[in-house]
Amino acid sequence: MIRAFGRDDRLAVMRLLRLMHQETVYSRNEVNWTKVRDRLDMHCGGYERMAGFVGDLDGDVAGVLLVGCGENWFSEQLFGFDVVFYVRPDRRGMLLGRGLLRAFEAWGREKGCCQVSIGVSSGVMVERTGRMLERLGWGHSGGIYRRDL
């Protein structure tokens, strides 16, 4: 079941974020878990232009999508963006990702966004994730390039 992320989900989402950090290119970066916890509060009702969704399978939070919306740089039109999109490895391919994306799209429409976007920047299953997004009607519009300093 896909539902809104709430304060009671913070511990479960923190566990997911720890897994995400270990699995992805972000494992090279330091983490301030107190800051992460505080940022989670922004996505569970703390800010009008931020939201979150969780994939809950019988009380087991196995996926999370944290999102926001803001004005386009060129105009006042709103666009939606993801902050975190993660599904636990043992639950991938079980429609959780699709459900989270659909919730994001609905939220974006409700907020008046003209567009929503998802970044595939984790370095994990990039091609597979891209194919899923394209099957669901999302278009590829670029890439992310990194250089460690």
Regions found by a protein language model. Name each.
Residues 93-106:
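Conserved acetyl-CoA-binding loop-helix of GNAT-fold acetyltransferases
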Residues 71-82, 141:
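A conserved beta-turn-beta hairpin within the catalytic core of GNAT-like acetyltransferases
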Residues 117-128:
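Conserved beta-strand-loop-alpha-helix junction that forms the acyl-donor binding cleft
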Residues 54, 60-69:
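Conserved beta-strand in the GNAT
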Residues 1-15:
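A short beta-loop-alpha structural element at the N-terminal edge
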Residues 21-40:
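Conserved GNAT-fold acetyl-CoA-binding loop/helix
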Residues 41-54:
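A short helix-loop-beta-strand connector motif used in the catalytic cores of GNAT acetyltransferases and
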Residues 83-93:
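A short, internal acetyl-CoA/4′-phosphopantetheine-binding micro-motif in the GNAT/acyltransferase core
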